[in-house]
Amino acid sequence: MRFPHICIMMNTLSDLSELSVLKGPNSISELRKYASILVIDDNEFAPESSLKRNGYQIQHKIDLDTMKDVEPYDIILCDISGVGKKLGFKNEGAFIIREIHASYPNKRIIAYTSYTYNPNYNQFFSMADFVAPKDLAI
């Protein structure tokens, strides 16, 4: 499923229900049913069960085996630290974001982290459609 434009209206992950989709599903329930979400995080993703209960199609991976692992998903929520190690990426999740941005320009990327990074990481964060702290309320 291709989403040419997604605009996040609020500041929480649950606000994915407030997405404005120019072409695609006609309702929020259709978006939940058809938009697939991949979470790449080496830690437990606490909101996963809540999002699933609310009808979201969500999959959690601790790391990627190959970059092709992201192909089936429309929205990728990627941690910055602790992921990308299997692929040997020096900048871990930041490099995953760069690769998704370059290889899959129609995917929506959310950088998700609990750390503050030095300005060298700004180039990676700018490739994400949205940057969210891990303590974001859901």
Residue ranges and their predicted role:
Residues 95-124, 128:
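A short, hydrophobic beta-strand element within the central beta-sheet of small alpha/beta folds
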Residues 43-47, 80-88, 115-118, 137:
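Short acidic, S/G/P-rich loop/turn micro-motifs used as interaction or catalytic elements
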Residues 130-133:
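A structural signal for hydrophobic residues in beta-strands of small regulatory alpha/beta folds
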Residues 70-106:
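Conserved phosphotransfer microenvironments
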Residues 39-42, 61, 76, 100:
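Conserved sequence signature across two-component system core domains
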Residues 51-73:
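A short, well-structured beta->alpha microelement
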Residues 1-38, 42-49, 54-56:
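Non-catalytic signal-transmission and effector/linker regions of two-component phosphorelay proteins
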